C-alpha cells in the first residue's frame, strides 16, 4: 500500500457505517439487487437524481478533524462574562458533566414514549418538574420548553386559550428581556394579538387578556409584582412571570405574588452558556390550566403489579395527536439539559443552592456598596445579582474591562451593567471594583459594610427542595450511584438499535461529541462582542456552506432550535414573502393527510387555514386531489407542506409535478426535512422544487436526541425567501434584514451543538455522505424484505422498494388474534429492543428506520425478535395461549417476574429470555406495563414519596 493509502482519509466512514463490504453484498443479495447503484435506481425517481458529486471538501480523519476544529475554536476569545441578559457562566458539577452530558447512556436515548424502558430519565425529569414547582410555588410544571423566549410566547398563547377576557391585547413589561420581546412580537402578529408595552404600574390601566412581567427586570431591578398582577387578574387577564431560576432561590415565588404561569431559563443550574444554547426553559402553571399547557408533562401512574411508575401524561394535548388543534407545535424539547438542571438541584440540595444564590447576591451587594462609597451612581438600589452603574466614563471603564478580560453590558452612552454569577470569584470582584472606582478594594471591609439589596417583602420565606431526592445525594459517591441507577433503567443506543421511523437514530460518534464541552465553545455568551466570537462565526459559516452544498439552497438560517421551530421559521419566511408582494391574504396551507402532526400545528400557529390533501391507496399524495384543491384555493394559496421521501417511507414519483402545481397557483413549497437522511448525495430538496426546508441536525446530521432534546432545525431557503429569515434584536444575524423579528432566544439557536454536525460532514466528505444514504436505503430494504416473510409491508415505491424506512401492517393480525401494536411494542422490550414508531403515520402499524449505522448482526437480531413475536402471535391466534394471558399482553416482563408465583401458560424462560442472545445481554425493564388510563385520571406531576417506589 502507498503512503497515501496508509494515511486513510476515509477511516471515519467505516466507523459510521455499520455493515462491512461483505455484509453489504449479502444484504444486496437478500433484496435481489445486483449492486447498490441498481438499488438506488430502483428506489429514486430518475428525474430527481443528482448526477454529480456534492461540493464538499475531502474527508478528514478523526484526529485531523478534531485538530482543525480546535484551531477554529481557538479563534474565540472567552472573556469572563458579566453581561447577564438571561445567560450566565456556571460551574457544572464535574460528576454530572462526565456521567450525564458526556455519557451515551443519557444522550443517545429517545423521547420516553416507551415509558417502561425510560424510567430513569422520567425520574430525572420528574425531579426537574418538582424543582420548578418548588421554586415557582405553582402546582404543576412541564418537562421543559426550548428557551425562555419561546416559553414566554407559549405563555401568551396559553393565556389566550384560558382567559375569560374578550380582549386581544396582551401587556408586556417594558423590563422584559429584549430577546423575549423579539420572539413574542413574531408570535403575536400571527396569533392576531396586540402587544402593549409598559411599566408594570401601567398594567392595570387597560383591558388585557394576559400579561407578562419580568422578575427581576432585564436591568436587574427588583419590584414587588403583587399589585400589578392583581390589577390584570381583576379584569379577567391571565398573568405570567418570567423569573430568573437562581433568583427564585432567594426571592418570593411568582405564585405568592399571584401569578398563574411562571417561566424562565434553567441554564444557571449547571448548563454552560454555549453561545446561546441548548438550555431547558421551565414552564409552571396552575393545576386548572394543565390541559391547556404546552410541552411534555411527566406524570405518576402504576404498572400492572400496582408499582409506582412514570410516564408522559396528558398526551392528547400534543401535536402528534391533536394536529392543528394542538396547544403547541412543540415536539423535541430540551430533556438532556432539563436533566442536568434537575440533577444540579439534586446534587446541591436546598442548602447548596441557597448558599450559591446568597454568594451571588453578596458579590453584587459588595460591588454596589463599593461603587456608591466611591461616589458612583447606581441606576437602582434593589437587585439580586445585576448592578447598573451610571458612569460618565463608561467608555473608558468598558474598554479597560475588555483589556482585563471582562465583558460588561453596555446600556446607552453612560450606563454599564454588571451581572454576577456562580463562577464569579473574590478576585473578579476586586478587579471589577478597581475598574469602576480607580482604586484597590478592601473586600473584607466592604463585606462588613455592605447591606442586603433584596427588599424584606421580596425575600423567600417558603421552603424549597424538601423532597428526599434533593436531600440525599450530596457526596460524589452517592450522586454517582444515583445517576448510574437512573441510567440503568433506560434503554439507549449504547445498548441496542432504536429503529424509530422518521427519527433517524444513527451513530452519535465520540469525535463529533468531544468539541461541545471545549471551553472555547461552552463558555461563550451569545451577546459577547463579535470580535470575540470569530471562531464560532467561522464554524457557523462553514456549516452553512456544507448545508447549502447538500441541500441546494441559497441561504441557511441557523436560528431555529428544533425541527418544529424550523417549520415555524420556514412558514414565517413564506408569509413574510407573500406580505412583501402585497399578498398577505394568502393563508391556505395544503398538507397531505399522512403528514407529521407538527405540520398542521405549525400552520395553525401561523394563522394559516389547513386544507388536507388525500393520499391514494399506495400511500402517495393524490395528485388529482392536490391539483383540484390548489385550483380551488389559487387566490389564497400560501404553501404546501410535504415530507420527502413521504412519511409512508417511499419516494413518490410525482414529487416534481406536485411542486410545479403549487408554484403554478401562487404557492410556495415547504419540504419537511424529517427524511433528509434518504436524500443526501442522491438528490437535493431545492433541486426537486422546494422553496424552503428545515434540516433536523439531530437526525440526519448526528446530533443525539438526548432523551427528548436538544435538537436543531435550521432552514434552507431559495434566494427569493432569503430576505425573510429571522433576525435578532440584540445580536443581528449576518445576512438577515434589519427589523425582521426572531423565532428563538439566541441568534444562532443552540449553537454549542453545531460542532457535532460540522464534524460529521467534515469526517465523511462528499462520497461518505452519499454512501451513508445508500446504506440507509439498503438497510431499510433489507429489513423490509426479511420482515415481509412474517408481516405485510404496507407501502412500497414504483419498483417495490422502500426508502430509508418501512411500515409493517399489524392490523390483519390484530383482527385475527386480538394482539395489538402496543402488545408488540411492549414485547420487543423483552427482546432488548425499543419499539419502532407506533401507529404513525397509519394506526395499527410499526414504522421502522434502521439507519446506515447499524451492523448487519443487529439488523438480524431485530428480524429474529420480530419473527419470534410473529410465532407468538400465531400461538395466540390458534388458541394455544389465551388472549388475555400470553407473553404479548403481559409484556414487558420485569425483574419482579423472576421470582414468585408463575400462573401463566408459557414458561418463565419464554417470558423473560425468549431467544438465546437475550440471555447473554438482558436489558430489564424496571417496571411492568404501565396503566396509561390510571395516569391520566389521577394526574400527579410531582415527585411521589420514596416509599412508593418500593
UniProtKB/Swiss-Prot annotation:
One of its GO terms (cellular component) is cytosol. Its cofactor is pyridoxal 5'-phosphate. It holds the Pfam family GcvP2_C. It catalyses: N(6)-[(R)-lipoyl]-L-lysyl-[glycine-cleavage complex H protein] + glycine + H(+) = N(6)-[(R)-S(8)-aminomethyldihydrolipoyl]-L-lysyl-[glycine-cleavage complex H protein] + CO2. Its EC number is 1.4.4.2. One of its GO terms (biological process) is glycine decarboxylation via glycine cleavage system. It is an enzyme of class 1 (oxidoreductase). Keywords: Oxidoreductase, Pyridoxal phosphate. The modification N6-(pyridoxal phosphate)lysine is found at residue 699. One of its GO terms (molecular function) is glycine binding. Belongs to the GcvP family. The glycine cleavage system catalyzes the degradation of glycine. The P protein binds the alpha-amino group of glycine through its pyridoxal phosphate cofactor; CO(2) is released and the remaining methylamine moiety is then transferred to the lipoamide cofactor of the H protein. The glycine cleavage system is composed of four proteins: P, T, L and H. NCBIfam families: gcvP, PRK04366.1. This is Glycine dehydrogenase (decarboxylating). The gene is gcvP.
Amino acid at each position: 500500500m502507498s503512503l497515501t493509502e496508509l494515511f486513510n482519509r476515509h477511516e471515519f466512514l467505516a466507523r459510521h457505517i455499520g455493515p462491512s463490504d461483505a455484509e453489504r453484498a449479502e444484504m444486496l443479495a437478500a433484496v435481489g439487487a445486483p449492486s447498490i447503484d441498481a438499488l438506488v435506481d430502483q428506489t429514486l425517481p430518475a428525474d430527481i437524481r443528482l448526477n454529480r458529486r456534492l461540493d464538499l471538501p475531502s474527508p478528514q480523519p478523526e484526529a485531523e478533524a478534531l485538530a482543525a476544529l480546535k484551531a477554529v475554536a481557538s479563534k474565540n476569545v472567552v472573556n469572563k462574562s458579566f453581561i447577564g441578559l438571561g445567560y450566565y457562566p456556571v460551574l457544572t458539577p464535574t460528576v454530572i458533566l462526565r456521567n450525564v452530558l458526556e455519557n451515551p447512556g443519557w444522550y443517545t436515548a429517545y423521547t420516553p414514549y416507551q415509558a417502561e424502558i425510560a424510567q430513569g430519565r422520567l425520574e430525572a425529569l420528574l425531579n426537574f418538574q418538582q424543582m420548578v414547582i418548588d421554586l415557582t410555588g405553582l402546582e404543576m410544571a412541564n418537562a421543559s420548553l426550548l428557551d425562555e423566549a419561546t416559553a414566554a410566547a407559549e405563555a401568551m398563547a396559553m393565556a389566550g386559550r384560558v382567559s375569560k377576557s374578550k380582549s386581544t391585547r396582551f401587556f408586556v413589561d417594558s423590563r422584559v428581556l429584549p430577546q423575549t420581546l423579539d420572539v413574542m412580537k413574531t408570535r403575536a402578529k400571527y396569533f392576531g394579538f396586540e402587544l402593549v408595552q409598559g411599566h408594570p404600574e401601567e398594567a392595570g390601566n387597560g383591558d388585557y387578556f394576559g400579561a407578562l412581567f419580568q422578575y427581576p427586570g432585564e436591568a436587574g431591578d427588583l419590584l414587588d409584582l403583587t399589585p400589578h398582577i392583581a390589577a390584570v387578574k381583576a379584569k379577567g387577564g391571565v398573568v405570567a412571570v418570567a423569573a430568573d431560576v437562581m433568583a427564585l432561590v432567594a426571592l418570593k415565588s411568582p405564585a405568592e405574588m399571584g401569578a398563574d404561569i411562571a417561566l424562565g431559563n434553567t441554564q444557571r443550574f449547571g448548563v454552560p452558556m454555549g453561545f446561546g444554547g441548548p438550555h431547558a426553559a421551565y414552564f409552571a402553571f396552575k393545576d386548572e390550566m394543565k390541559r391547556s399547557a404546552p410541552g411534555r408533562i411527566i406524570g405518576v401512574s402504576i404498572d400492572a403489579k400496582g408499582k409506582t411508575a412514570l410516564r408522559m401524561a396528558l398526551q392528547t394535548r400534543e401535536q402528534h395527536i391533536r394536529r392543528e388543534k394542538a396547544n403547541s407545535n412543540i415536539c423535541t424539547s430540551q430533556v438532556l439539559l432539563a436533566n442536568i438542571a434537575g440533577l444540579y438541584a439534586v446534587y446541591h440540595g436546598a442548602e447548596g443552592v441557597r448558599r450559591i444564590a446568597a454568594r451571588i447576591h453578596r458579590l453584587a451587594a459588595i460591588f454596589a456598596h463599593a461603587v456608591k462609597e466611591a461616589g458612583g451612581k447606581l441606576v437602582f438600589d434593589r437587585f439580586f445579582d445585576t448592578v447598573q452603574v451610571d458612569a460618565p466614563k463608561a467608555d473608558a471603564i468598558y474598554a479597560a474591562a475588555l483589556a482585563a478580560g471582562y465583558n460588561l453590558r453596555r446600556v446607552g452612552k453612560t450606563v454599564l451593567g454588571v451581572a454576577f454569577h456562580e463562577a464569579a470569584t473574590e478576585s473578579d470582584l476586586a478587579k471589577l471594583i478597581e475598574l469602576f472606582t480607580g482604586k484597590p478594594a478592601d473586600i473584607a471591609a466592604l463585606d462588613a459594610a455592605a447591606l442586603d439589596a433584596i427588599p424584606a417583602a421580596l425575600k423567600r420565606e417558603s421552603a424549597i427542595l424538601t423532597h428526599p431526592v434533593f436531600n440525599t445525594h450530596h457526596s460524589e459517591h452517592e450522586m454517582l450511584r444515583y445517576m448510574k441507577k437512573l441510567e440503568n433503567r433506560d434503554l439507549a443506543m449504547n445498548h441496542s438499535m432504536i429503529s424509530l421511523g422518521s427519527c433517524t437514530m444513527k451513530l452519535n460518534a465520540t469525535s463529533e461529541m468531544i468539541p461541545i464541552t471545549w471551553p472555547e465553545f461552552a463558555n461563550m455568551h451569545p451577546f459577547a462582542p463579535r470580535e470575540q466570537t470569530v471562531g464560532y462565526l467561522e464554524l457557523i459559516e462553514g456549516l452553512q456552506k456544507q448545508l447549502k452544498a447538500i441541500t441546494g439552497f441559497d441561504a441557511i438560517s441557523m436560528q431555529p432550535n428544533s425541527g418544529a421551530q424550523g417549520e415555524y421559521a420556514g412558514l414565517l419566511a413564506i408569509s413574510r414573502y407573500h406580505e412583501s408582494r402585497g399578498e398577505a391574504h394568502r393563508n391556505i396551507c395544503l398538507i397531505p393527510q399522512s403528514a407529521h402532526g407538527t405540520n398542521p400545528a405549525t400552520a395553525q400557529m401561523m394563522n394559516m387555514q389547513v386544507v388536507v390533501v388525500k393520499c391514494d391507496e399506495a400511500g402517495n399524495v393524490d395528485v388529482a386531489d392536490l391539483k383540484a384543491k390548489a385550483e380551488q384555493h389559487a387566490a389564497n394559496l400560501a404553501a404546501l407542506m410535504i415530507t420527502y421521501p413521504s412519511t409512508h417511507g417511499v419516494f413518490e414519483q410525482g414529487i416534481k409535478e406536485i411542486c410545479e402545481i403549487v408554484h403554478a397557483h401562487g404557492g410556495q413549497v415547504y419540504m419537511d426535512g424529517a427524511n433528509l437522511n434518504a436524500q443526501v448525495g442522491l438528490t437535493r430538496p431545492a433541486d426537486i422544487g422546494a422553496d424552503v426546508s428545515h434540516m433536523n441536525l439531530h437526525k440526519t446530521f448526528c446530533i443525539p436526541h438526548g432523551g427528548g432534546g436538544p435538537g436543531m432545525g435550521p432552514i434552507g431557503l431559495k434566494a427569493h425567501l432569503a430576505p425573510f429569515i429571522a433576525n435578532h434584536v440584540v445580536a443581528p444575524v449576518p445576512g438577515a434584514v434589519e427589523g425582521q423579528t426572531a423565532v428563538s432566544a439566541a441568534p444562532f439557536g443552540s449553537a454549542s451543538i453545531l460542532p457535532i454536525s460540522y464534524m460529521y460532514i467534515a469526517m465523511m466528505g462528499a462520497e461518505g455522505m452519499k454512501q451513508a444514504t445508500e446504506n440507509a436505503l439498503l438497510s431499510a430494504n433489507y429489513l423490509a424484505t426479511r420482515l415481509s416473510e412474517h408481516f405485510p409491508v404496507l407501502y412500497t415505491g414504483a419498483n417495490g422498494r422502500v426508502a430509508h424506512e418501512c411500515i409493517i401492517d399489524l392490523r390483519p393480525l390484530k383482527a385475527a388474534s386480538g394482539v395489538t401494536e402496543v402488545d408488540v411494542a411492549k414485547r420487543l422490550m423483552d427482546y432488548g429492543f425499543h419499539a419502532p414508531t407506533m401507529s404513525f403515520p397509519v394506526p395499527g402499524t410499526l414504522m421502522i428506520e434502521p439507519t446506515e449505522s447499524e451492523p448487519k448482526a443487529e439488523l438480524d437480531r431485530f428480524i429474529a425478535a420480530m419473527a419470534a413475536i410473529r410465532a407468538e402471535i400465531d400461538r395466540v391466534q390458534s388458541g394455544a395461549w389465551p388472549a388475555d394471558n400470553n407473553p404479548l399482553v403481559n409484556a414487558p416482563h420485569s425483574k419482579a417476574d423472576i421470582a414468585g408465583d408463575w400462573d401463566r401458560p408459557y414458561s418463565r424462560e419464554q417470558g423473560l429470555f425468549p431467544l438465546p442472545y437475550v440471555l447473554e445481554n438482558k436489558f430489564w425493564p424496571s417496571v411492568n406495563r404501565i396503566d396509561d388510563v390510571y395516569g391520566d385520571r389521577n394526574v400527579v406531576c410531582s415527585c411521589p414519596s420514596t416509599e412508593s417506589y418500593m
